[in-house]
């Protein structure tokens, strides 16, 4: 998902813990780069190459600096070649950034021509983060079962949030209490995700929540640690990273001790042919029902696929977005009351909230989209790998194996695309009233969820969950930074990825509930 992103802010602390490891291998990496230059996949697409500082500097410098300087080179390339294409040099390969003028001819091409899963695998160093690319089962399940079911799932989500707000927030009736907003949002989303994805039997078990959240963190930690290294070093570094080794152990535990037994139990009950048995109505069961091959149906494969979709496409990304939204409200408190007024109007009774009520939260929807415009998951989107030589309408040849993308960040901050792009306007998309103005809508001017047939399929579910959490939070709590915190915490940049800095405490206190 799109979508798909890097790192928890808390990774910064973990990176420090593993600093000794990193410095040793950083030195080794530089040595290898300088003396044995074997860069990862290079593309021979005939487009300008954007280098850091000067076009005359060796490409190796741009590769080494990409992780810390990516936004500057991405914006530089966009400013010069936004109507054509340009090339970026990453430590582990090349990216060809295409203009949105190619969007219409590319967006509907099949996976046999432009493969999104393979691009995701590459962008998230999938060989070391347990990403599966052997089928579209999870995407099919989202599109055919999850998204159409959102309306009837809302009461379950609300029920789980009622419980989650009780157990995850501190007692703060009489005074402001500090919380780590990202960690709280992470557990809220993880609880909701577990209720919908694995059902009632396991969703509130702390062993599941801990295992799935730790798994999520280790995925993004592994990505953050591996990205600075050239691709040819990944087999060495990836296999000795503590976070990568932890991932392997956690995956085995979840497969064999948690999800595997649950899947086998369900299949045993189905085999009995008991007329009183009702299949669980959750994502895991939907995948079991839709799996077409023996490989897709294997309990370990189902478990790994479910973990991937929940950790990367639901839990982490939603928690990051919620943290960004809260920070934006803290530094722009003038938007809090309009949001509360809308919530009180549209959600008169919290437990009776419907999908229609949530769709009517137009100001909130616009705020979510504007927050995402300023704090996208990454500067690049629409990642695809070209599966066979492809010639575009203007004659540009994309050889087989080329990794293409589009500059979603610069596009959404371009004054030719967005009026007054440097101004945060919470009502921007309420005023637009066009088909692409909704938070989950995609188009050439707003690509943070991707574009075309493989745009983030889980965005509809994530949007509903985020709106419910934000509605409950704004109705129930007052909140502020510490007195000495006067500015929004700066985002962290990991290559082209953008994550919130969650080292800043937030102080909350109960207020008279309005819903």
From Swiss-Prot:
Pathway, per record: Secondary metabolite biosynthesis
CDD domains assigned: CYP503A1-like (cd11041)
Keyword Lipid biosynthesis in record: no
Sugar attachment sites: 501
Keyword terms, alphabetized: Glycoprotein, Iron, Membrane, Metal-binding, Monooxygenase, Oxidoreductase, Transmembrane, Transmembrane helix
Known cofactor(s): heme
Membrane topology term: Single-pass membrane protein
One Gene Ontology MF term: monooxygenase activity
Entry similarity comment: Belongs to the cytochrome P450 family.
Known role: Cytochrome P450 monooxygenase; part of the gene cluster that mediates the biosynthesis of the indole diterpenes janthitremanes such as shearinine K or shearinine A. The geranylgeranyl diphosphate (GGPP) synthase janG catalyzes the first step in janthitremane biosynthesis via conversion of farnesyl pyrophosphate and isopentyl pyrophosphate into geranylgeranyl pyrophosphate (GGPP). Condensation of indole-3-glycerol phosphate with GGPP by the prenyl transferase janC then forms 3-geranylgeranylindole (3-GGI).
Name of this protein: Cytochrome P450 monooxygenase janP
Lineage: Eukaryota, Fungi, Dikarya, Ascomycota, Pezizomycotina
């Amino acid at each position: 998902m799109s979508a798909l992103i890097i790192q928890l802010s808390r990774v910064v602390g973990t990176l420090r813990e593993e600093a000794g490891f990193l410095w040793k291998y950083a030195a080794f990496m530089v040595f290898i780069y300088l003396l044995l230059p074997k860069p990862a996949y290079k593309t021979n697409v005939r487009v300008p190459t954007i280098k850091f500082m000067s076009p005359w500097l060796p490409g190796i410098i741009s590769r080494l600096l990409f992780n810390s300087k990516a936004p500057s080179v991405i914006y530089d390339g966009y400013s010069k070649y936004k109507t054509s294409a340009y090339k970026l040099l990453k430590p582990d390969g090349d990216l060809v950034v295409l203009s949105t003028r190619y969007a219409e001819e590319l967006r509907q091409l099949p996976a046999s021509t432009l493969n999104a899963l393979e691009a995701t695998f590459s962008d998230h160093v999938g060989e070391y983060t347990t990403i599966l690319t052997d089928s579209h089962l999870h995407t099919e399940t989202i599109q055919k079962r999850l998204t159409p079911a959102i309306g009837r799932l809302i009461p379950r989500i609300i029920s789980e949030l009622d419980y989650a707000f009780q157990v995850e927030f501190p007692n703060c009736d009489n005074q402001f209490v500090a919380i780590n907003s990202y960690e709280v949002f992470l557990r809220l989303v993880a609880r909701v995700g577990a209720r919908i994805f694995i059902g009632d039997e396991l969703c509130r078990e702390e062993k599941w929540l801990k295992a799935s959240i730790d798994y999520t963190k280790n995925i993004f930690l592994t990505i953050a640690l591996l990205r600075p290294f050239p691709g040819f070093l990944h087999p060495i570094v990836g296999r000795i990273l503590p976070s990568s080794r932890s991932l392997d152990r956690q995956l085995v535990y979840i497969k064999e001790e948690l999800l595997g037994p649950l899947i086998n139990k369900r299949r045993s009950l189905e085999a009995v042919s008991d007329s009183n048995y009702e299949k669980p109505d959750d994502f895991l069961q939907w995948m079991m029902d839709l799996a077409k091959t023996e490989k897709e149906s294997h309990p370990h494969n189902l478990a790994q696929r479910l973990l991937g979709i929940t950790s990367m496409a639901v839990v982490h990304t939603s928690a990051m977005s919620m943290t960004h939204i809260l920070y934006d409200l803290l530094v722009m408190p003038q938007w809090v009351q309009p949001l509360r007024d809308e919530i009180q109007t549209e959600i008169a009774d919290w437990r009776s909230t419907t999908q229609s009520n949530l769709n009517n939260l137009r100001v909130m929807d616009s705020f979510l989209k504007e927050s995402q415009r300023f704090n996208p998951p990454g500067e690049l989107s629409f990642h695809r790998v070209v599966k066979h030589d492809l010639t575009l309408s203007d004659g540009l040849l994309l050889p087989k194996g080329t990794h293409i993308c589009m500059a979603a960040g610069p596009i959404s901050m371009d004054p030719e695309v967005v009026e007054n792009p440097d101004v945060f306007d919470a009502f921007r998309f309420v005023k637009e009233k066009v088909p692409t103005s909704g938070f989950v809508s995609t188009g050439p001017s707003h690509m943070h969820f991707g574009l075309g047939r493989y745009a983030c399929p889980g965005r509809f579910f994530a949007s509903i969950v985020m709106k419910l959490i934000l509605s409950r939070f704004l109705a129930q709590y007052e909140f502020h930074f510490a007195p000495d915190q006067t500015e929004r915490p700066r985002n962290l940049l990991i290559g082209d990825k953008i994550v919130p800095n969650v080292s800043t405490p937030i102080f909350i206190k109960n207020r008279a509930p309005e819903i």
